[in-house]
């Protein structure tokens, strides 16, 4: 029996395990939010980054990619990889996956999904909601072993766009981060010019 894994964050563009088939599509009743703190990939314990998790949301959908894994050895390798990679995500759900918005039956039933819950007892890295500008400022500054937090956001934005998916939360956040970076560059240019004039 095949195992299916749903990716809605970095798994979309960086899978990290062997698979036999990938299907773009969506799950129902959830939305993607930058509410999970990352202290091991896109941030540090002293300054966490923010990565996506899923939040229950009636009548909303979360787009991503489902990966089919059939060989037993590949299943074991995938699970070993995911249990390390997603170790800060404290819930594992099995949800219906759709590829057609008009379909009443899922394309795949029971895709495995890693979710970081808001339960602080089981997930002490949960950061929760915050104003868009505050989340953007945190993402601009944070970086970890896997690289700058902003790269995670921009990679997600690009990966979704390449699949033809739109996610307002991701787009708005990416635009806010670009705005902050643009302002920072302008300040750097002004400071450099002022220093040059004083030499």
From Swiss-Prot:
Pfam assignment, any one: ChaC
Alphabetically ordered keywords of this record: Cytoplasm, Lyase
InterPro entries the UniProt entry points to: ChaC, GGCT-like, GGCT-like_sf
UniProt xrefs under Gene3D superfamilies: Gamma-glutamyl cyclotransferase-like
Subcellular location(s) of the protein: Cytoplasm
EC number: 4.3.2.7
Active site: 86
Keyword Lyase annotated: yes
Cofactor(s) the record lists: Mn(2+)
Note describing how the cofactor binds: Binds 2 Mn(2+) ions per subunit.
Binding-site positions, substrate: 5-10
Enzyme class: lyase
Protein name according to UniProt: Gamma-glutamylcyclotransferase 2-3
Native source species: Arabidopsis thaliana
Gene for this chain: GGCT2;3
